[in-house]
């Protein structure tokens, strides 16, 4: 690692849900961008081998720093590939994005880590510990399945946040994610803490009504009730739902297609403001926990 700068007290946040398609990669993009714009040096690590975060960060093609030999049959990870973090002696050089964030990306081949002896997860933890001294925040976009890669992301993290949609499979993914977090906390990382859940793509019927009294559609309201039940069963209350991000279909589709955050593409849009508020809430919660 050739980054030379004063030591920082880096905080690692893993973004995870045991269900794909919950806007995990885009929200990782939004939160990390907002952290950087707020003056916090931020590193993004894509640990979902579907590479959604990586592909939207580099919509014009995969950089050679992530995949050195893309046209050959053999896998040749570059120095900015997440794969390298699972080894104790590899060169790691994050890509510096135009907005100031640093980025370590992935490709499908990261899945190969799941067939290695599971002690590689501790090499990963050591490499992330070394990176923490260079950053204020490290945002890890985790994968939605219990595996070496998923466990590694959690044993290296300080905090977990869980995005979800208001529908059955997504809230069930929240329940599984919290169960896995508690298992990993008990066996590997007792310092791991749950910051909260945030609802993505919320379709609001009436902003003037209370959460369970008509703000959302009847189906979404029932799913929210069940999400609250899941939290209660895990020992948490409704305050752990940190944000309800409104769904603006055209803005969302166009921003994602262009590889932009909402703040870059439509800074006055409701989702841009809500992700900014969520980011500030995360900072406040972490600072409060550190003071405590």
Model-derived features: positions:
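P-loop NTP-binding core
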Residues: 1-292
């Amino acid at each position: 690692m050739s980054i030379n700068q004063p030591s920082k007290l880096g905080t690692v946040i893993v973004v995870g849900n045991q269900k794909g398609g919950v806007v995990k990669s885009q929200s990782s993009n939004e939160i990390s961008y907002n952290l950087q714009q707020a003056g916090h040096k931020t590193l993004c690590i894509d640990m979902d081998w579907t590479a959604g975060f990586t592909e939207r960060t580099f919509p014009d093609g995969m950089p050679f720093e992530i995949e050195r030999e893309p046209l050959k049959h053999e896998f040749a990870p570059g120095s900015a590939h997440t794969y390298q973090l699972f080894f104790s002696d590899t060169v790691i050089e994050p890509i510096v994005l135009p907005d100031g964030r640093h980025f370590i990306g992935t490709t499908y081949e990261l899945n190969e880590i799941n067939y290695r002896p599971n002690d590689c997860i501790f090499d990963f933890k050591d490499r992330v510990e070394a990176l923490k001294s260079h950053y204020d925040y490290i945002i890890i976009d985790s994968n939605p399945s219990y595996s070496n890669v998923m466990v590694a992301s959690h044993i290296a993290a300080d905090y977990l946040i869980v995005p979800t949609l208001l529908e059955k499979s997504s809230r069930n993914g929240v329940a599984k994610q919290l169960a896995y977090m508690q298992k990993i906390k008990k066996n590997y990382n007792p310092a791991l803490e749950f910051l909260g859940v945030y609802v993505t793509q919320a379709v609001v019927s009436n902003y003037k009504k209370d959460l369970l009294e008509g703000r959302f559609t009847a189906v979404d309201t029932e799913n929210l009730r069940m999400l609250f039940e899941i939290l209660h069963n895990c020992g948490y209350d409704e305050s752990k739902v940190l944000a309800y991000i409104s769904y603006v279909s055209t803005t969302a589709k166009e921003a994602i297609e262009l590889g932009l955050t909402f703040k870059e593409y439509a800074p006055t849009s409701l989702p841009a403001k809500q992700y900014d508020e969520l980011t500030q809430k995360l900072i406040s919660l972490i600072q409060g926990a550190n003071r405590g």
